[in-house]
Amino acid sequence: MHRTTRIKITELNPHLMCVLCGGYFIDATTIIECLHSFCKTCIVRYLETSKYCPICDVQVHKTRPLLNIRSDKTLQDIVYKLVPGLFKNEMKRRRDFYAAHPSADAANGSNEDRGEVADEDKRIITDDEIISLSIEFFDQNRLERKGNKEKEKSKEEVNDKRYLRCPAAMTVMHLRKFLRSKMDIPNTFQIDVMYEEEPLKDYYTLMDIAYIYTWRRNGPLPLKYRVRPTCKRMKIGHQREGLSNSGELESDSGSDKASSPAGGLPSTSSCLPSPSTPVQSPHPQFPHISSTMNGTSSSPGSNHQSSFTNRARKSSINGSSATSSG
């Protein structure tokens, strides 16, 4: 699994800044011949005296270069979302300009041109913004009931939901720690924060979640959580060492027992559980949580025991093979 890397905005500046003014794009405009982008006012002023791209010297148009430039709304939205405070400052500058120059004709312009668009309307989220969210326990049975088109909600379902107001820069990891401390969940259990049915990564911020899942601000950001036992990974290195040590011991004594089929049977390691030994639940204080690991139950059935004991085992010692029926 590839590890996600986070980059600084300074590494993206060459793709977000205008080479004519040295600032971030405002009203980003792209030349259709070479796809280089600039601020609208910068490129319009430049093309009054030149008909070539200021970066690659491609001819924009022989006589009317303004015909081959297009407004790039997608690029401008990316710049506004990546640069903190840029959209708010630009809207303030436009409002101040039209307030100082009432004679300026802005009647034909949009609300954004006049600086009358708020961050909420543009869906721009800043790091210091407070986001309202709701979080509730992820219940698979509840999803099945919704699939059966049952619209009535019981009081228990309504009370399960909690509402929080958090900074947009707060990460999923902080939210998991908050849930663990509030609910006194032991470290033997894993907490997953989810959006609908998809688990969220620890480094996601609330702002990332709002952008990724296109939160429309028509209600609190809906999040869910689930609690499950922590999967314990087996240490393969220690098992290999144990197998190699047992193999060395068998090879030392194998020369005396090479002719005997019974003597060639490998000994079972004492650290591995017997298939006939019942395994108790590791979490008696949470009986409702299953102790199933890796898709297999902790208590094997009788059929599995009989097939395990009746299976023929074959081992090779010093080039000779021995088979036993168990």
Swiss-Prot record:
One of its GO terms (biological process) is negative regulation of transcription by RNA polymerase II. Residues 279-310 have a biased composition (Polar residues). A motif (Nuclear localization signal) lies at residues 81-95. SUPFAM superfamilies: RING/U-box. It is found in: Nucleus; Cytoplasm. GO terms for molecular function: promoter-specific chromatin binding; zinc ion binding. Residues 162-182 are annotated as: Interaction with PHC2. Component of a Polycomb group (PcG) multiprotein PRC1-like complex, a complex class required to maintain the transcriptionally repressive state of many genes, including Hox genes, throughout development. PcG PRC1 complex acts via chromatin remodeling and modification of histones; it mediates monoubiquitination of histone H2A 'Lys-119', rendering chromatin heritably changed in its expressibility. In the PRC1-like complex, regulates the E3 ubiquitin-protein ligase activity of RNF2/RING2. Component of a PRC1-like complex. This is Polycomb complex protein BMI-1. It comes from Gallus gallus (Chicken). The gene is BMI1.
